[in-house]
Amino acid sequence: MHDPIADMLTRIRNGQQAKHQQVTLVSSKLKEEIARVLKEEGYIQDFFTETLPNGLKSITLKLKYYHGRPVIEFIKRISRPGLRVYKSYKDLHSIPGFGVAILSTSKGIMTHVSAKVKGVGGEVICEVA
């Protein structure tokens, strides 16, 4: 696997299309922070991490539905290993459909709205709506 974040986003997308209640994947600090932002913004119900018997940490995301439809209409990787995308806080614009962009900034992982308020730019990890 060359891009673990793209894998995470694909698992969320596929899990919701298949109407799964939760998806589980190998954990990392970045994935946990992305999950935290998704929970704060109301795109997932909850998430938790656990250590497996083999010593690896896993993260389980509880997916969220509204009237039987997935809350996440689209989730798209923006910055990827072959093409990094960085934006200044001045260049951060709204996402169609009340969506958010998730950024990695010098002050941590946050939405584009928080980054604008704090006056920081960073790498645009993904867009969610």
Swiss-Prot record:
GO molecular function: rRNA binding; structural constituent of ribosome
SUPFAM superfamilies named among the record's database cross-references: Ribosomal protein S8
Keyword Cytoplasm annotated: no
Biological-process GO terms, alphabetical: translation
Domain of life: Bacteria
Record's keyword terms, sorted: Ribonucleoprotein, Ribosomal protein, RNA-binding, rRNA-binding
GO cellular component, one term: ribosome
HAMAP family associated with the record: Ribosomal_uS8_B (MF_01302_B)
Quaternary organization: Part of the 30S ribosomal subunit. Contacts proteins S5 and S12.
Record's function text: One of the primary rRNA binding proteins, it binds directly to 16S rRNA central domain where it helps coordinate assembly of the platform of the 30S subunit.
Homology family: Belongs to the universal ribosomal protein uS8 family.
Protein name: Small ribosomal subunit protein uS8
Lineage: Bacteria, Pseudomonadati, Pseudomonadota, Gammaproteobacteria, Legionellales
Gene: rpsH
